[in-house]
Amino acid sequence: MPWEEIEHTADAAFRVWADTPEDLLVEAAKALFDLITDLDAVEPEEEVEIEAEGGDLVELLHDWLEEIHFRHEIDGMLFSDFEVKELKKEEGWKVRGVARGEPYDPDRHPFHTEVKAVTYHNMKVEREDGRWVAEYVVDL
């Protein structure tokens, strides 16, 4: 599992690592939904397109996670599989991808915790020892 929950006083914080920025976005989204439910219980039956942008990789990560979280909140979806189809840097960063999952079913999906929002607090994205590393905090 290429992420770990790290200590934070009132909220939940994660440190995520990957070989590429694309994989970093995927693993950050998996960590977010692993906090909400058991990923193994969520079947990737429906596909939702996700687009996000940011002036830098921190803003992009925030917008990516917030867009996925928004689809969870508004559509009642749980996601377990994510794919970045395109990541490009022009004037800023843009990502286009998909989140796969299914509608929340309380009989099948254990509820771990409610995530209110992804925050910018202590958020970072950087290269460390040849791999990409991100840290982020979610408001519970």
Swiss-Prot record:
One example of a Gene Ontology biological process annotation: tRNA splicing, via endonucleolytic cleavage and ligation
UniProt-annotated binding residues for Ca(2+): 11, 139-140
GO molecular function: calcium ion binding
Keyword Hydrolase attributed: no
Signal peptide start-end: none
Keywords: Calcium, Metal-binding, tRNA processing
Domain of life, source organism: Archaea
Keyword Cell wall biogenesis/degradation part of the UniProt annotation: no
Family of the protein in this entry: Belongs to the archease family.
Protein purpose: Activates the tRNA-splicing ligase complex by facilitating the enzymatic turnover of catalytic subunit RtcB. Acts by promoting the guanylylation of RtcB, a key intermediate step in tRNA ligation. Can also alter the NTP specificity of RtcB such that ATP, dGTP or ITP is used efficiently.
Name of the protein: Protein archease
